[in-house]
Curated annotation (Swiss-Prot):
Keyword terms, alphabetized: ATP-binding, Chaperone, Cytoplasm, Nucleotide-binding, Stress response
Main location as per UniProt: cytoplasm
PANTHER family xrefs: HEAT SHOCK PROTEIN 90 FAMILY MEMBER
Cell compartments where the protein resides: Cytoplasm
Subunit structure: Homodimer.
InterPro entries: HATPase_C_sf, Heat_shock_protein_90_CS, HSP90_C, Hsp90_fam, Hsp90_N, Ribosomal_Su5_D2-typ_SF
GO molecular function: ATP binding; ATP hydrolysis activity; ATP-dependent protein folding chaperone; unfolded protein binding
Superkingdom of source: Bacteria
Segments of this protein annotated with the region B: 346-562
Official protein name in the record: Chaperone protein HtpG
Function: Molecular chaperone. Has ATPase activity.
SMART domains: HATPase_c
Protein backbone atom coordinates (compact mmCIF):
# COMPACT_ATOMS: atom_id res chain seq x y z
CA UNK A 1 0.00 0.00 0.00
CA UNK A 2 1.38 3.42 -1.02
CA UNK A 3 2.38 5.80 1.73
CA UNK A 4 2.77 8.83 -0.51
CA UNK A 5 2.63 12.26 1.13
CA UNK A 6 3.01 15.75 -0.30
CA UNK A 7 4.90 18.34 1.74
CA UNK A 8 5.44 22.05 1.17
CA UNK A 9 8.98 23.35 1.09
CA UNK A 10 10.07 25.60 3.95
CA UNK A 11 9.74 29.25 2.82
CA UNK A 12 13.52 29.71 2.87
CA UNK A 13 14.00 26.69 0.58
CA UNK A 14 11.61 28.19 -1.98
CA UNK A 15 13.61 31.43 -1.90
CA UNK A 16 16.92 29.57 -2.15
CA UNK A 17 15.76 27.47 -5.11
CA UNK A 18 14.57 30.55 -6.96
CA UNK A 19 17.78 32.43 -6.25
CA UNK A 20 20.05 29.55 -7.23
CA UNK A 21 18.37 28.98 -10.55
CA UNK A 22 18.67 32.70 -11.36
CA UNK A 23 22.00 33.55 -9.69
CA UNK A 24 24.25 30.55 -10.34
CA UNK A 25 23.58 30.24 -14.06
CA UNK A 26 27.18 31.24 -14.86
CA UNK A 27 28.62 28.23 -13.02
CA UNK A 28 26.02 25.50 -13.48
CA UNK A 29 28.47 22.61 -13.30
CA UNK A 30 28.89 23.05 -9.53
CA UNK A 31 25.76 20.90 -9.10
CA UNK A 32 27.93 17.83 -9.73
CA UNK A 33 30.62 18.98 -7.31
CA UNK A 34 28.00 19.48 -4.59
CA UNK A 35 26.19 16.17 -5.14
CA UNK A 36 29.43 14.14 -5.36
CA UNK A 37 30.68 15.91 -2.24
CA UNK A 38 27.47 14.97 -0.38
CA UNK A 39 27.78 11.37 -1.59
CA UNK A 40 31.39 11.19 -0.35
CA UNK A 41 30.26 12.58 3.02
CA UNK A 42 27.62 9.84 3.22
CA UNK A 43 30.35 7.24 2.66
CA UNK A 44 32.54 8.84 5.35
CA UNK A 45 29.64 8.79 7.82
CA UNK A 46 28.93 5.11 7.18
CA UNK A 47 32.60 4.25 7.65
CA UNK A 48 32.52 6.03 11.02
CA UNK A 49 29.28 4.36 12.21
CA UNK A 50 30.57 0.95 11.10
CA UNK A 51 33.51 1.27 13.50
CA UNK A 52 31.10 0.26 16.26
CA UNK A 53 28.57 -1.67 14.13
CA UNK A 54 30.17 -3.61 11.28
CA UNK A 55 26.77 -5.05 10.26
CA UNK A 56 25.90 -1.67 8.69
CA UNK A 57 28.15 -2.59 5.76
CA UNK A 58 25.68 -5.39 4.90
CA UNK A 59 28.57 -7.40 3.45
CA UNK A 60 29.65 -4.56 1.13
CA UNK A 61 32.47 -2.49 2.62
CA UNK A 62 33.77 -1.16 -0.71
CA UNK A 63 32.44 2.40 -0.51
CA UNK A 64 32.11 4.37 -3.74
CA UNK A 65 30.18 6.98 -5.73
CA UNK A 66 28.85 6.14 -9.20
CA UNK A 67 27.78 8.58 -11.90
CA UNK A 68 25.86 7.63 -15.02
CA UNK A 69 24.01 9.47 -17.76
CA UNK A 70 21.27 8.62 -20.25
CA UNK A 71 21.40 10.90 -23.29
CA UNK A 72 18.07 9.72 -24.70
CA UNK A 73 16.18 10.29 -21.47
CA UNK A 74 18.19 13.40 -20.59
CA UNK A 75 19.09 12.21 -17.09
CA UNK A 76 22.15 12.17 -14.84
CA UNK A 77 22.29 9.82 -11.83
CA UNK A 78 24.61 10.10 -8.83
CA UNK A 79 24.56 6.98 -6.67
CA UNK A 80 26.40 6.12 -3.45
CA UNK A 81 26.44 3.15 -1.09
CA UNK A 82 26.91 5.33 1.97
CA UNK A 83 24.82 5.79 5.08
CA UNK A 84 21.50 6.56 3.32
CA UNK A 85 18.44 8.25 4.85
CA UNK A 86 15.24 7.28 6.64
CA UNK A 87 11.84 8.75 5.74
CA UNK A 88 12.07 11.30 8.57
CA UNK A 89 15.62 12.15 7.53
CA UNK A 90 14.53 12.74 3.94
CA UNK A 91 11.74 15.13 5.00
CA UNK A 92 14.08 16.99 7.34
CA UNK A 93 17.12 17.27 5.06
CA UNK A 94 15.45 17.62 1.66
CA UNK A 95 12.64 19.96 2.68
CA UNK A 96 14.17 22.45 5.07
CA UNK A 97 17.39 24.36 5.55
CA UNK A 98 18.50 23.12 8.94
CA UNK A 99 20.80 26.03 9.61
CA UNK A 100 20.51 28.73 12.23
CA UNK A 101 20.43 32.32 11.04
CA UNK A 102 18.64 31.69 7.72
CA UNK A 103 16.61 34.87 8.16
CA UNK A 104 19.85 36.86 8.39
CA UNK A 105 21.13 35.10 5.26
CA UNK A 106 18.13 36.18 3.21
CA UNK A 107 18.26 39.69 4.66
CA UNK A 108 21.79 40.02 3.26
CA UNK A 109 20.76 39.15 -0.29
CA UNK A 110 21.00 42.17 -2.55
CA UNK A 111 19.12 41.07 -5.66
CA UNK A 112 22.32 41.52 -7.66
CA UNK A 113 23.15 38.19 -9.28
CA UNK A 114 26.96 38.35 -8.96
CA UNK A 115 26.88 39.27 -5.26
CA UNK A 116 24.08 36.85 -4.41
CA UNK A 117 25.78 33.92 -6.13
CA UNK A 118 28.77 34.47 -3.86
CA UNK A 119 26.55 34.58 -0.78
CA UNK A 120 24.62 31.49 -1.84
CA UNK A 121 27.94 29.72 -2.32
CA UNK A 122 28.98 30.64 1.21
CA UNK A 123 25.66 29.35 2.51
CA UNK A 124 26.36 25.94 0.99
CA UNK A 125 23.99 25.07 -1.84
CA UNK A 126 24.38 21.31 -1.35
CA UNK A 127 21.53 19.12 -2.57
CA UNK A 128 19.43 22.02 -3.86
CA UNK A 129 22.07 22.80 -6.51
CA UNK A 130 20.50 19.94 -8.51
CA UNK A 131 17.72 22.34 -9.54
CA UNK A 132 20.21 24.62 -11.31
CA UNK A 133 20.08 22.16 -14.23
CA UNK A 134 17.14 19.83 -13.45
CA UNK A 135 13.43 20.36 -14.07
CA UNK A 136 12.73 17.41 -11.77
CA UNK A 137 14.78 15.51 -9.18
CA UNK A 138 14.11 11.94 -8.02
CA UNK A 139 15.80 10.52 -4.92
CA UNK A 140 15.74 6.85 -3.91
CA UNK A 141 17.40 6.11 -0.59
CA UNK A 142 17.65 3.45 2.10
CA UNK A 143 19.37 3.94 5.44
CA UNK A 144 22.11 1.44 6.33
CA UNK A 145 20.77 -1.24 8.67
CA UNK A 146 17.13 -0.80 7.59
CA UNK A 147 15.00 -3.33 5.69
CA UNK A 148 14.75 -3.20 1.89
CA UNK A 149 11.03 -2.30 2.09
CA UNK A 150 11.82 0.73 4.32
CA UNK A 151 13.41 2.70 1.50
CA UNK A 152 12.13 6.14 0.50
CA UNK A 153 11.26 7.84 -2.78
CA UNK A 154 11.45 11.66 -2.85
CA UNK A 155 10.44 13.71 -5.90
CA UNK A 156 10.12 17.40 -6.67
CA UNK A 157 10.09 19.83 -9.57
CA UNK A 158 11.66 22.50 -7.38
CA UNK A 159 8.53 24.60 -7.11
CA UNK A 160 6.51 24.74 -3.90
CA UNK A 161 6.34 21.11 -2.79
CA UNK A 162 7.80 17.60 -2.85
CA UNK A 163 6.35 14.09 -2.51
CA UNK A 164 7.62 11.27 -0.30
CA UNK A 165 6.71 7.61 -0.66
CA UNK A 166 7.85 4.26 0.76
CA UNK A 167 9.51 1.92 -1.77
CA UNK A 168 11.67 -1.20 -1.85
CA UNK A 169 15.40 -0.78 -2.52
CA UNK A 170 17.75 -3.75 -2.22
CA UNK A 171 20.98 -1.80 -1.73
CA UNK A 172 21.65 0.78 0.97
CA UNK A 173 22.63 4.36 0.14
CA UNK A 174 21.21 7.13 -2.02
CA UNK A 175 20.52 7.44 -5.74
CA UNK A 176 19.74 10.92 -7.10
CA UNK A 177 18.41 11.21 -10.66
CA UNK A 178 18.32 14.62 -12.33
CA UNK A 179 15.82 15.05 -15.19
CA UNK A 180 17.63 17.77 -17.11
CA UNK A 181 15.98 20.81 -18.61
CA UNK A 182 16.10 20.85 -22.42
CA UNK A 183 18.71 23.61 -22.45
CA UNK A 184 20.94 21.66 -20.00
CA UNK A 185 21.19 18.38 -21.95
CA UNK A 186 24.97 18.92 -22.35
CA UNK A 187 25.31 17.46 -18.84
CA UNK A 188 24.00 14.09 -20.08
CA UNK A 189 27.16 13.80 -22.16
CA UNK A 190 29.61 11.28 -20.69
CA UNK A 191 32.74 13.27 -21.62
CA UNK A 192 31.31 16.48 -20.19
CA UNK A 193 30.69 14.68 -16.88
CA UNK A 194 34.20 13.19 -16.90
CA UNK A 195 35.78 16.61 -17.33
CA UNK A 196 33.74 18.01 -14.41
CA UNK A 197 34.69 15.07 -12.16
CA UNK A 198 38.38 15.54 -12.99
CA UNK A 199 38.09 19.25 -12.30
CA UNK A 200 36.17 19.13 -9.01
CA UNK A 201 36.42 15.67 -7.46
CA UNK A 202 39.97 14.41 -7.95
CA UNK A 203 40.78 15.01 -4.27
CA UNK A 204 37.83 13.07 -2.86
CA UNK A 205 39.06 10.02 -0.94
CA UNK A 206 36.11 7.83 -2.02
CA UNK A 207 36.37 6.35 -5.56
CA UNK A 208 34.13 8.22 -8.05
CA UNK A 209 33.25 5.79 -10.84
CA UNK A 210 31.72 6.04 -14.32
CA UNK A 211 30.60 3.18 -16.53
CA UNK A 212 33.15 2.20 -19.18
CA UNK A 213 31.40 0.43 -22.08
CA UNK A 214 32.84 -2.88 -23.20
CA UNK A 215 34.02 -3.51 -26.75
CA UNK A 216 32.84 -6.32 -29.08
CA UNK A 217 35.23 -8.84 -30.59
CA UNK A 218 37.01 -7.29 -33.58
CA UNK A 219 39.80 -7.86 -36.09
CA UNK A 220 43.24 -6.44 -35.39
CA UNK A 221 45.48 -4.70 -37.99
CA UNK A 222 47.14 -8.02 -38.89
CA UNK A 223 43.90 -9.95 -39.11
CA UNK A 224 44.15 -11.34 -35.60
CA UNK A 225 41.06 -11.51 -33.40
CA UNK A 226 40.91 -8.97 -30.56
CA UNK A 227 38.67 -10.46 -27.88
CA UNK A 228 35.62 -8.63 -26.60
CA UNK A 229 35.90 -6.75 -23.32
CA UNK A 230 33.22 -6.40 -20.72
CA UNK A 231 31.99 -3.05 -19.48
CA UNK A 232 33.09 -2.02 -16.00
CA UNK A 233 32.92 0.82 -13.50
CA UNK A 234 36.08 2.89 -13.99
CA UNK A 235 37.50 5.02 -11.17
CA UNK A 236 37.74 8.61 -12.44
CA UNK A 237 39.54 10.27 -9.52
CA UNK A 238 42.76 9.64 -7.58
CA UNK A 239 40.61 8.43 -4.63
CA UNK A 240 43.33 9.10 -2.06
CA UNK A 241 43.18 11.46 0.90
CA UNK A 242 44.67 14.64 -0.56
CA UNK A 243 46.18 15.68 2.77
CA UNK A 244 48.22 12.45 2.92
CA UNK A 245 49.90 13.14 -0.42
CA UNK A 246 53.23 14.90 -0.72
CA UNK A 247 52.83 18.69 -0.93
CA UNK A 248 55.06 18.84 -4.01
CA UNK A 249 52.60 16.58 -5.89
CA UNK A 250 49.54 18.76 -5.21
CA UNK A 251 48.73 21.68 -7.50
CA UNK A 252 47.21 24.97 -6.34
CA UNK A 253 44.07 24.05 -8.29
CA UNK A 254 43.75 20.79 -6.33
CA UNK A 255 44.19 22.61 -3.02
CA UNK A 256 41.51 25.13 -4.03
CA UNK A 257 39.03 22.47 -5.14
CA UNK A 258 39.57 20.54 -1.92
CA UNK A 259 38.87 23.75 0.00
CA UNK A 260 35.56 24.17 -1.83
CA UNK A 261 34.73 20.52 -1.11
CA UNK A 262 35.21 20.77 2.66
CA UNK A 263 33.92 24.32 3.12
CA UNK A 264 31.13 24.44 0.50
CA UNK A 265 32.48 27.89 -0.30
CA UNK A 266 31.98 29.19 -3.80
CA UNK A 267 35.15 31.31 -3.91
CA UNK A 268 38.85 30.42 -3.68
CA UNK A 269 40.66 30.40 -0.35
CA UNK A 270 42.98 33.33 0.40
CA UNK A 271 45.83 31.07 1.56
CA UNK A 272 46.48 27.64 3.04
CA UNK A 273 49.03 25.64 5.00
CA UNK A 274 49.62 21.88 4.72
CA UNK A 275 51.80 20.27 7.39
CA UNK A 276 52.73 16.92 8.84
CA UNK A 277 53.71 17.09 12.52
CA UNK A 278 55.93 14.41 14.05
CA UNK A 279 57.16 14.05 17.61
CA UNK A 280 55.15 13.55 20.79
CA UNK A 281 51.99 13.88 18.71
CA UNK A 282 51.71 12.78 15.11
CA UNK A 283 49.11 14.47 12.96
CA UNK A 284 48.57 16.15 9.62
CA UNK A 285 46.72 19.42 9.22
CA UNK A 286 45.49 21.26 6.17
CA UNK A 287 44.33 24.75 7.11
CA UNK A 288 42.65 27.36 4.92
CA UNK A 289 41.97 31.07 5.40
CA UNK A 290 38.86 31.94 3.34
CA UNK A 291 38.85 35.02 1.13
CA UNK A 292 35.35 36.02 2.28
CA UNK A 293 33.72 35.95 5.71
CA UNK A 294 30.72 33.61 5.95
CA UNK A 295 27.44 35.50 6.26
CA UNK A 296 26.80 34.00 9.71
CA UNK A 297 30.26 34.60 11.21
CA UNK A 298 28.76 36.48 14.18
CA UNK A 299 25.94 34.02 14.80
CA UNK A 300 26.47 32.49 18.26
CA UNK A 301 24.78 29.24 17.22
CA UNK A 302 27.00 28.82 14.16
CA UNK A 303 29.07 25.65 14.20
CA UNK A 304 32.75 26.06 13.49
CA UNK A 305 35.89 24.02 13.76
CA UNK A 306 37.98 21.59 11.75
CA UNK A 307 37.00 18.27 10.22
CA UNK A 308 38.53 15.54 12.36
CA UNK A 309 39.96 12.34 10.90
CA UNK A 310 41.72 9.60 12.85
CA UNK A 311 44.05 7.47 10.71
CA UNK A 312 42.23 8.64 7.54
CA UNK A 313 38.81 7.71 8.97
CA UNK A 314 36.35 10.62 9.13
CA UNK A 315 35.19 11.15 12.74
CA UNK A 316 33.30 14.45 12.91
CA UNK A 317 32.66 17.87 11.41
CA UNK A 318 33.12 21.10 13.36
CA UNK A 319 35.64 19.83 15.93
CA UNK A 320 35.93 23.23 17.63
CA UNK A 321 38.28 21.88 20.33
CA UNK A 322 41.30 22.30 18.02
CA UNK A 323 40.82 25.99 17.30
CA UNK A 324 40.22 28.98 19.58
CA UNK A 325 37.03 30.94 18.97
CA UNK A 326 38.86 34.02 17.64
CA UNK A 327 40.15 31.84 14.75
CA UNK A 328 36.71 30.37 13.99
CA UNK A 329 36.94 31.53 10.39
CA UNK A 330 39.68 28.96 9.66
CA UNK A 331 38.55 25.99 7.56
CA UNK A 332 40.32 22.68 7.11
CA UNK A 333 41.00 19.34 8.67
CA UNK A 334 43.21 17.49 11.09
CA UNK A 335 44.15 13.81 10.81
CA UNK A 336 45.55 12.32 14.02
CA UNK A 337 47.43 9.08 14.59
CA UNK A 338 47.17 9.38 18.38
CA UNK A 339 43.46 9.75 19.10
CA UNK A 340 41.29 6.61 19.44
CA UNK A 341 38.87 5.79 16.61
CA UNK A 342 35.95 5.87 19.04
CA UNK A 343 36.79 9.42 20.14
CA UNK A 344 33.82 11.61 21.16
CA UNK A 345 33.40 15.35 21.64
CA UNK A 346 33.43 14.75 25.40
CA UNK A 347 36.78 12.91 25.22
CA UNK A 348 38.21 15.71 23.05
CA UNK A 349 37.13 18.37 25.53
CA UNK A 350 39.54 17.40 28.28
CA UNK A 351 42.38 15.63 26.55
CA UNK A 352 46.10 16.46 26.73
CA UNK A 353 46.59 15.35 23.11
CA UNK A 354 43.82 17.71 21.97
CA UNK A 355 45.32 20.59 23.96
CA UNK A 356 48.79 20.03 22.49
CA UNK A 357 47.36 19.89 18.96
CA UNK A 358 45.27 23.02 19.58
CA UNK A 359 48.40 24.89 20.72
CA UNK A 360 50.33 23.78 17.64
CA UNK A 361 47.53 24.59 15.18
CA UNK A 362 46.92 28.02 16.75
CA UNK A 363 50.62 28.88 16.36
CA UNK A 364 50.52 27.62 12.79
CA UNK A 365 47.58 29.91 11.86
CA UNK A 366 49.16 32.94 13.55
CA UNK A 367 52.36 32.17 11.64
CA UNK A 368 50.42 32.04 8.35
CA UNK A 369 48.93 35.47 9.08
CA UNK A 370 52.28 36.97 10.15
CA UNK A 371 53.88 35.77 6.93
CA UNK A 372 51.01 37.14 4.85
CA UNK A 373 51.22 40.53 6.60
CA UNK A 374 54.98 40.68 5.97
CA UNK A 375 54.99 39.41 2.38
CA UNK A 376 51.78 40.86 0.95
CA UNK A 377 50.34 43.89 2.77
CA UNK A 378 47.55 44.31 0.20
CA UNK A 379 46.38 40.71 0.60
CA UNK A 380 46.59 41.06 4.38
CA UNK A 381 44.32 44.12 4.19
CA UNK A 382 41.86 41.96 2.27
CA UNK A 383 41.99 39.44 5.13
CA UNK A 384 41.66 42.19 7.74
CA UNK A 385 38.57 43.67 6.06
CA UNK A 386 36.83 40.27 6.35
CA UNK A 387 38.10 38.89 9.67
CA UNK A 388 39.86 41.67 11.58
CA UNK A 389 37.02 42.21 14.05
CA UNK A 390 37.05 38.50 14.98
CA UNK A 391 40.82 38.52 15.48
CA UNK A 392 40.34 41.37 17.97
CA UNK A 393 38.70 38.84 20.32
CA UNK A 394 42.09 37.13 20.61
CA UNK A 395 43.88 39.15 23.33
CA UNK A 396 41.00 38.50 25.75
CA UNK A 397 40.84 34.81 24.91
CA UNK A 398 44.44 33.73 24.40
CA UNK A 399 46.86 35.15 26.95
CA UNK A 400 49.78 32.99 25.77
CA UNK A 401 49.62 34.45 22.24
CA UNK A 402 48.47 37.96 23.19
CA UNK A 403 51.59 39.72 21.87
CA UNK A 404 51.54 37.83 18.56
CA UNK A 405 47.85 38.59 18.03
CA UNK A 406 48.44 42.26 18.92
CA UNK A 407 51.10 42.42 16.20
CA UNK A 408 48.48 41.33 13.65
CA UNK A 409 45.93 44.01 14.58
CA UNK A 410 45.36 47.02 12.33
CA UNK A 411 43.99 50.47 13.22
CA UNK A 412 43.20 53.83 11.70
CA UNK A 413 45.52 56.58 12.90
CA UNK A 414 46.00 60.34 12.92
CA UNK A 415 49.24 59.69 10.99
CA UNK A 416 47.50 58.43 7.83
CA UNK A 417 44.53 60.82 7.85
CA UNK A 418 42.41 57.95 6.52
CA UNK A 419 39.61 55.85 8.00
CA UNK A 420 41.26 52.71 6.60
CA UNK A 421 42.70 50.50 9.38
CA UNK A 422 46.20 50.00 7.95
CA UNK A 423 48.45 50.85 10.91
CA UNK A 424 50.00 48.06 12.99
CA UNK A 425 51.31 48.55 16.52
CA UNK A 426 54.83 48.02 15.13
CA UNK A 427 54.22 50.83 12.62
CA UNK A 428 53.19 53.04 15.55
CA UNK A 429 56.28 52.13 17.61
CA UNK A 430 58.57 52.91 14.67
CA UNK A 431 57.18 56.48 14.53
CA UNK A 432 57.14 57.26 18.26
CA UNK A 433 58.68 60.56 19.34
CA UNK A 434 61.95 60.50 21.24
CA UNK A 435 61.08 60.22 24.92
CA UNK A 436 57.57 58.86 24.20
CA UNK A 437 56.81 55.80 26.33
CA UNK A 438 53.10 55.25 25.66
CA UNK A 439 50.89 54.21 22.75
CA UNK A 440 48.04 56.74 22.66
CA UNK A 441 44.58 55.77 21.44
CA UNK A 442 40.97 56.92 21.47
CA UNK A 443 37.76 54.85 21.26
CA UNK A 444 34.66 56.56 19.86
CA UNK A 445 31.32 55.75 18.20
CA UNK A 446 32.58 56.48 14.70
CA UNK A 447 35.83 57.23 12.90
CA UNK A 448 34.74 60.84 12.45
CA UNK A 449 34.00 61.22 16.17
CA UNK A 450 37.42 59.78 17.02
CA UNK A 451 39.35 61.82 14.44
CA UNK A 452 37.64 65.10 15.43
CA UNK A 453 37.63 64.58 19.19
CA UNK A 454 38.81 67.60 21.21
CA UNK A 455 40.90 65.18 23.31
CA UNK A 456 43.41 65.04 20.43
CA UNK A 457 44.10 68.79 20.24
CA UNK A 458 47.31 68.97 22.28
CA UNK A 459 48.64 65.70 20.83
CA UNK A 460 48.04 66.96 17.29
CA UNK A 461 49.82 70.20 18.12
CA UNK A 462 52.83 68.20 19.32
CA UNK A 463 52.73 65.82 16.33
CA UNK A 464 52.04 62.75 18.49
CA UNK A 465 50.27 59.91 16.67
CA UNK A 466 47.00 58.58 18.10
CA UNK A 467 45.30 55.31 17.12
CA UNK A 468 41.64 55.89 16.20
CA UNK A 469 39.28 53.09 17.23
CA UNK A 470 35.58 53.05 16.41
CA UNK A 471 34.44 49.43 16.22
CA UNK A 472 32.11 48.05 18.90
CA UNK A 473 34.66 45.45 19.94
CA UNK A 474 37.51 47.97 20.40
CA UNK A 475 36.64 48.87 23.99
CA UNK A 476 36.55 45.17 24.87
CA UNK A 477 39.88 44.64 23.10
CA UNK A 478 41.61 47.50 24.86
CA UNK A 479 40.52 46.26 28.28
CA UNK A 480 42.59 43.13 27.66
CA UNK A 481 45.44 44.62 25.63
CA UNK A 482 47.09 47.03 28.05
CA UNK A 483 50.63 46.98 26.64
CA UNK A 484 52.64 45.95 23.61
CA UNK A 485 56.40 45.36 23.60
CA UNK A 486 56.68 46.97 27.06
CA UNK A 487 54.85 50.12 25.95
CA UNK A 488 51.58 50.89 27.74
CA UNK A 489 48.46 51.67 25.73
CA UNK A 490 47.00 54.89 27.10
CA UNK A 491 43.52 56.31 26.43
CA UNK A 492 43.51 60.04 25.70
CA UNK A 493 40.01 60.28 27.20
CA UNK A 494 40.85 58.67 30.54
CA UNK A 495 42.57 60.19 33.60
CA UNK A 496 45.64 62.38 33.18
CA UNK A 497 47.16 62.69 29.71
CA UNK A 498 50.67 61.79 30.97
CA UNK A 499 53.02 63.01 28.25
CA UNK A 500 56.12 62.26 30.35
CA UNK A 501 59.31 63.49 28.67
CA UNK A 502 57.27 64.94 25.81
CA UNK A 503 55.96 67.63 28.15
CA UNK A 504 57.87 70.91 27.82
CA UNK A 505 59.03 72.29 31.21
CA UNK A 506 57.95 75.85 30.37
CA UNK A 507 54.54 74.62 29.18
CA UNK A 508 54.11 72.60 32.34
CA UNK A 509 54.94 75.60 34.50
CA UNK A 510 52.49 77.81 32.55
CA UNK A 511 49.82 75.12 32.89
CA UNK A 512 50.28 74.89 36.66
CA UNK A 513 50.11 78.69 36.94
CA UNK A 514 46.88 78.80 34.89
CA UNK A 515 45.34 76.07 37.07
CA UNK A 516 46.24 78.02 40.20
CA UNK A 517 44.76 81.26 38.84
CA UNK A 518 41.58 79.42 37.74
CA UNK A 519 40.97 77.74 41.12
CA UNK A 520 38.08 80.13 42.08
CA UNK A 521 36.40 79.52 38.69
CA UNK A 522 36.78 75.75 39.13
CA UNK A 523 35.10 75.94 42.55
CA UNK A 524 32.21 78.02 41.14
CA UNK A 525 31.61 75.47 38.35
CA UNK A 526 31.78 72.60 40.86
CA UNK A 527 29.10 74.29 42.95
CA UNK A 528 26.96 75.00 39.87
CA UNK A 529 27.14 71.43 38.50
CA UNK A 530 26.88 69.70 41.87
CA UNK A 531 26.35 65.93 41.74
CA UNK A 532 26.34 65.71 37.93
CA UNK A 533 30.17 65.50 37.81
CA UNK A 534 32.84 63.67 39.81
CA UNK A 535 35.23 66.61 39.65
CA UNK A 536 36.10 69.80 37.76
CA UNK A 537 39.69 70.47 36.64
CA UNK A 538 41.70 72.76 34.41
CA UNK A 539 42.56 70.79 31.27
CA UNK A 540 46.02 69.98 29.99
CA UNK A 541 44.78 68.42 26.73
CA UNK A 542 42.65 71.15 25.03
CA UNK A 543 43.86 74.01 22.86
CA UNK A 544 40.80 75.04 20.76
CA UNK A 545 37.77 73.68 22.66
CA UNK A 546 36.24 75.21 25.81
CA UNK A 547 35.71 71.96 27.72
CA UNK A 548 35.67 68.16 27.61
CA UNK A 549 34.67 65.25 29.84
CA UNK A 550 37.17 62.62 30.95
CA UNK A 551 36.65 59.17 32.46
CA UNK A 552 38.44 58.61 35.74
CA UNK A 553 41.16 55.95 36.06
CA UNK A 554 39.51 52.63 36.90
CA UNK A 555 36.07 53.90 35.86
CA UNK A 556 33.97 52.35 33.09
CA UNK A 557 34.27 54.31 29.83
CA UNK A 558 31.24 55.59 27.93
CA UNK A 559 31.91 53.04 25.16
CA UNK A 560 32.01 50.14 27.63
CA UNK A 561 28.79 51.40 29.23
CA UNK A 562 27.11 51.29 25.80
CA UNK A 563 28.37 47.74 25.23
CA UNK A 564 27.05 46.60 28.61
CA UNK A 565 23.68 48.29 28.05
CA UNK A 566 23.35 46.73 24.59
CA UNK A 567 23.97 43.32 26.18
CA UNK A 568 21.28 44.01 28.79
CA UNK A 569 23.81 44.10 31.64
CA UNK A 570 23.39 46.33 34.72
CA UNK A 571 25.66 49.37 34.54
CA UNK A 572 26.93 51.36 37.55
CA UNK A 573 26.49 55.12 37.53
CA UNK A 574 29.68 56.77 36.31
CA UNK A 575 30.16 60.51 36.76
CA UNK A 576 32.65 62.23 34.45
CA UNK A 577 35.46 64.58 35.34
CA UNK A 578 34.74 67.93 33.66
CA UNK A 579 37.85 69.64 32.27
CA UNK A 580 37.72 73.33 31.33
CA UNK A 581 40.05 75.36 29.14
CA UNK A 582 40.38 78.81 30.80
CA UNK A 583 42.23 80.14 27.73
CA UNK A 584 39.11 79.73 25.59
CA UNK A 585 37.01 82.94 25.15
CA UNK A 586 33.78 81.19 26.25
CA UNK A 587 35.29 80.06 29.56
CA UNK A 588 36.93 83.45 30.02
CA UNK A 589 33.53 85.18 29.55
CA UNK A 590 31.93 82.63 31.88
CA UNK A 591 34.33 83.71 34.60
CA UNK A 592 33.09 87.31 34.24
CA UNK A 593 29.42 86.40 34.81
CA UNK A 594 28.10 87.71 38.14
CA UNK A 595 24.57 86.29 37.80
CA UNK A 596 24.88 82.86 39.48
CA UNK A 597 21.74 81.47 37.77
CA UNK A 598 23.11 82.42 34.33
CA UNK A 599 26.53 81.08 35.38
CA UNK A 600 24.94 77.72 36.28
CA UNK A 601 23.07 77.59 32.94
CA UNK A 602 26.25 78.28 30.94
CA UNK A 603 28.21 75.73 32.99
CA UNK A 604 25.52 73.11 32.31
CA UNK A 605 25.47 73.97 28.62
CA UNK A 606 29.25 73.51 28.34
CA UNK A 607 29.05 70.20 30.24
CA UNK A 608 26.31 68.82 27.99
CA UNK A 609 28.17 69.96 24.87
CA UNK A 610 31.24 68.08 26.10
CA UNK A 611 29.17 64.97 26.87
CA UNK A 612 27.55 65.10 23.44
CA UNK A 613 31.00 65.31 21.83
CA UNK A 614 32.26 62.39 23.93
CA UNK A 615 29.28 60.02 23.82
CA UNK A 616 27.38 61.08 20.70
CA UNK A 617 24.17 61.24 22.74
CA UNK A 618 22.68 62.65 25.95
CA UNK A 619 20.58 61.03 28.66
CA UNK A 620 18.00 63.83 28.31
CA UNK A 621 18.32 65.54 24.90
CA UNK A 622 15.04 67.43 25.41
CA UNK A 623 16.43 69.19 28.50
CA UNK A 624 19.55 70.15 26.51
CA UNK A 625 17.48 71.63 23.67
CA UNK A 626 15.28 73.48 26.16
CA UNK A 627 18.36 74.97 27.86
CA UNK A 628 19.92 75.85 24.50
CA UNK A 629 16.74 77.63 23.34
CA UNK A 630 16.52 79.47 26.65
CA UNK A 631 20.12 80.72 26.27
CA UNK A 632 19.57 81.75 22.66
CA UNK A 633 16.42 83.64 23.56
CA UNK A 634 18.15 85.45 26.44
CA UNK A 635 20.95 86.58 24.12
CA UNK A 636 18.58 87.74 21.37
CA UNK A 637 16.78 90.19 23.66
Amino acid sequence: MSQQETHGFQTEVKQLLHLMIHSLYSNKEIFLRELVSNAADAADKLRYLALTNDALYEGDGELRVRISADKEKGTVTIEDNGVGMTRDGVIEHLGTIAKSGTAEFFKNLSGEASKDSQLIGQFGVGFYSAFIVAKKVTVRTRAAGHKANEAVLWESEGEGSFTVDTITKASRGTEITLHLRDEEKEFADEWRLRSIITKYSDHISVPVEMWQEGTPERDGPDGEKIPATEGYWKVMNKATALWMRNKSEISDEEYQEFYKHISHDYTDALLWSHNRVEGKQEYTNLLYIPSKAPWDLWNRDRKHGLKLFVQRVFIMDDAEQFMPSYLRFVQGLIDSNDLPLNVSREILQDNHITKAMRTGITKRVLGMLEKLAKDDAEKYQQFWAEFGQVLKEGPAEDFANRERIAGLLRFASTHTGSAAPTVSLDDYLSRMKEGQNKIYYIVADSHEAAANSPHLELLRKKGIEVLLMSERIDEWLINHLTEYKEKQLHSVTRGELELGELEDAAEKEAQEKLAEESAPLVERIKAALGASVADVKVTSRLTDTPACVVTGEGEMSSQMIKLMQAAGQPVPEVKPTFEINPAHPLVSRLNDLQDEAAFADWSNLLLQQAQLSEKGSLADPSAFIKLMNQMLLANLK
